[in-house]
């Protein structure tokens, strides 16, 4: 049975999930839950949508001479002066590397460990997978995005004169000017533009753009459709978030393409762990990500003030 279908009632989906637990099929229940959680992370997480992630194999790990923490060693981008890694829990303090190669450390992200009676699970009237999303996916997603954006902000702070621009914003033309400044910012660093990240409300501001800024066809399309479902501005891919603690309104982050900027690995992708004891179900989600930024110049921020 598919846990993603909208054609089956929540009661039937929940019953199928609980029946697996009652039948000793914890592994199957974990697989179904893990698949759903991973899907939602890639659909809604900021860094999961910005970059492609690859599961790394144990033979790609490199022994750490100081401890047993997992790591891999990768080449820094050819034109880069510095490289670093995203400080997930367990990776240690952030450091910058100037040599030809640098390490990517794998951390651990774990949701809160929850316990719930299967009788309580039976009483949930909405899809239990949606309940897992609210109680597991959001915790993991928040930790991923927070660790990444903290790294990005730290990089920009150390080199704000070259990687940040403030644009006075009072009319739609200023919005376009800010966007163009972001494009030019990466170009001045001798890098192409990959994707742009911003708050959803900042993206909605693009509805104020006039026909002389976006063209007649662009205006007609937006009048008919609005911006929901869009994922670009002037042909550049845009990724949005509604979390102002991750990206505040009126800020735009321009990233170089992944090949010029970062490497994203998973020692283990998000996995739902379930343990059934009598009527109690214990569960939590964990993963082991590692993200290296091979070129700290691959980011440019524009602030609209």
Which residues make up each language-model segment?
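Extended, solvent-exposed, turn-rich assembly/linker loops in the middle of proteins
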Residues: 156-230
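Helix N-cap / beta->alpha transition motif
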Residues: 114-118, 196-202, 228-230, 242, ...
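Intrinsically disordered, low-complexity, charge-biased terminal/linker regions in eukaryotic proteins
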Residues: 1-56, 60-61
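A short, structural micro-pattern
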Residues: 106-108, 190, 232, 277
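Sequence/fold signature of self-assembling virion shell proteins
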Residues: 2-11, 18-19, 26-27, 209-305
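Alpha-helical scaffold segments that mediate packing/assembly in large oligomeric complexes
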Residues: 111-188, 304-305
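Assembly/oligomerization interface modules of large self-assembling protein complexes
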Residues: 35-110
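Short, Φ-rich (hydrophobic/aromatic) sequence segments
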Residues: 32-47, 182, 252-270
